[in-house]
């Protein structure tokens, strides 16, 4: 009887201990520093690391090379952004302005576009930010020009960057309106007829911060702004107001903001772990924080990216570990 009682008491402890799973270089990950996490419609997890692109099928990793002719591109200037477009295609873009598309049939990444080298001889990294909008365009941004690559026609349009600032992130509001975060602040803009036009917005125009990440919720029309050592701010388009939550996270840098569900956001930080915020009340609480005294607890607080899958598992790019997975279903 005592034996069975001991096992019953031990069982819940065992379940809690299995909350976290770790994936590192010893498991096949190419590098401990992971920048982006994506999941395709087949179910594979994709990781953009310091060394290249890894695919994980739940058991093992496969590494992919980025080739420009006979030359492998493995420098940090070519490993910067990993996105999945609205049609489910995987794209990798680098600061040198080279765009790769994943070819599922041949299981390779194909170089489909690169900025003309002769136009940027003095700039080793001409692109400060790249992003995919809802209109089938990949944005290649620098301080003077925005190059729009049409993923369907493969045509490239040049748009003057009227901000004259380094762009760090973009969120699309509707077909032609955008929030654009830069090194200097945040702007409301319209892209129409291949012209980017700034739109006046008193509240946003007076916010002088270095924007790291943006998240826009179209249902409640709120923009969540993650800054470098300035915490999180919320711009409400309905009331035209800016709010900073009581737990402002000003002592850490915000790396990523992702929706956990319809009412809550996850806020990843560089040094403070992950926080959870209510989108209505802005109540912010620690959610996933390192516990170095626990054998099977969270094992790091420097989070570059997060991904919440359909099974409610949270995949974290957790330096210097690699990938940490939290599974609350255990």
Spans of features found by a protein language model:
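Carboxylate-rich, polar loop motifs that coordinate divalent cations or form catalytic acidic clusters
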Residues: 1-330
């Amino acid at each position: 009887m005592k034996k069975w009682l001991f096992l019953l008491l031990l069982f819940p402890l065992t379940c809690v201990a299995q909350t976290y799973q770790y994936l590192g270089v010893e498991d096949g990950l190419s590098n401990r520093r992971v920048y982006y996490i994506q999941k395709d419609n087949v179910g594979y997890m994709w990781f953009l690391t310091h060394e290249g692109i890894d695919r994980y099928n739940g058991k093992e990793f496969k590494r992919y090379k980025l080739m420009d002719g006979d030359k492998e591109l493995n420098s940090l200037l070519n490993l910067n952004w990993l996105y999945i477009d609205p049609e489910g295609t995987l794209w990798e873009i680098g600061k040198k302005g080279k765009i790769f598309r994943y070819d599922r049939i041949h299981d390779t990444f194909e170089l489909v576009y690169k900025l003309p080298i002769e136009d940027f001889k003095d700039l080793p990294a001409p692109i400060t930010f790249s992003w995919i909008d809802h209109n089938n365009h990949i944005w290649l941004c620098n301080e003077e020009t925005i190059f729009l690559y049409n993923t369907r026609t493969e045509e490239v349009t040049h748009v003057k960057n009227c901000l004259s600032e380094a762009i760090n992130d973009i969120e699309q509001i509707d077909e032609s309106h955008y929030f654009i975060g830069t090194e200097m602040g945040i702007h409301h803009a319209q892209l129409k007829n291949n012209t980017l036009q700034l739109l006046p917005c008193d509240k946003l125009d007076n916010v002088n911060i270095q924007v790291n990440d943006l998240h826009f919720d179209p249902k409640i029309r709120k923009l969540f702004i993650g800054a470098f050592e300035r915490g999180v701010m919320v711009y409400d388009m309905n009331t035209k107001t800016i709010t900073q939550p009581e737990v402002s996270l000003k002592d850490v840098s915000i790396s990523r903001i992702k929706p956990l569900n319809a009412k809550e956001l996850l806020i990843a930080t560089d040094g403070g772990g992950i926080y959870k915020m209510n989108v209505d009340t802005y109540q912010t609480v620690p959610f996933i924080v390192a516990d170095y005294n626990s054998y099977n607890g969270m094992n790091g607080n420097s989070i570059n990216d997060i991904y919440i899958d359909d099974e409610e598992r949270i995949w974290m790019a957790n330096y210097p570990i690699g990938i940490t997975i939290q599974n609350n279903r255990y």
